[in-house]
């Protein structure tokens, strides 16, 4: 858990807010007009709200922008007596949304932010207006057998091979010193963005073994298949999910989720919705192409009032 007031040399200048109503202290950013349309930005592995630092300012000129840190990430608390699962992260989000009484939300989800956004929507569709996916999957699309599986990605192969040797746990539970390497394995492309402040910001949530439990459990949750029951439990809400306007931004250098899989999954659910393919952009499009995300998000909202 990072010092709430650390701005990382002014690169994250947003007032901290906290919510402790769901068993841990959760940090979130809340910028822009309180009566504005709500954009709720969800990060994934192994990042935190810092991922959206270049988007919050421009977007908050027109919208209310809320950026939570998941339990075990960023400036949020890392309790050791909690389960770090898709279910728990989704339930944590639901508690925060209810606390803030957010409505007509534009959900933005990258990496694990996509499944969390999806599971939130199938259970709380009345609060969601639109969904903006970025290098992620909803997971409910029926795709052809010729489409690569998520398990075919370089990231998932790395996880599986490392579980046999102990490498996966060693690397991820030491994320404070390995976070850049992990992001490169997943598909981080923009090395020009990396400086001492960048390294410190992404390393700071993980000063020791225990603090990195969330970074370890995210991929294990998927690799082990333990997310399946919770995902299947949301099937009744898929009709509500696909009724929402949606868009997918897909960096084609993604090594966590095969781009062909992400696109096929999305098009199976939203066959007429836009897919924006980004050559040369990796898994972290917020880092690799920040201006593209802001422009496309604004246009998406304007096109779906």
Give the role of each language-model region.
Residues 1-18, 24-26, 31, 51, ...:
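Flexible "cap/lid" subdomain of the alpha/beta-hydrolase fold that forms the substrate-access gate
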Residues 30-75:
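Conserved HGGG/HGGXW glycine-rich cap/lid loop of the alpha/beta-hydrolase fold
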Residues 46, 263-264, 294:
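Short amphipathic alpha-helical segment that frequently serves as the phosphate-/nucleotide-binding helix
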Residues 47, 59, 114, 287-290, ...:
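Alpha-helical and His/Cys-centered functional microenvironments
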Residues 136, 293-297:
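Short, hydrophobic-biased amphipathic alpha-helical segments
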Residues 281-290, 294:
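Catalytic histidine-centered segment of alpha/beta-hydrolase-like enzymes
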Residues 296-304:
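C-terminal alpha-helix
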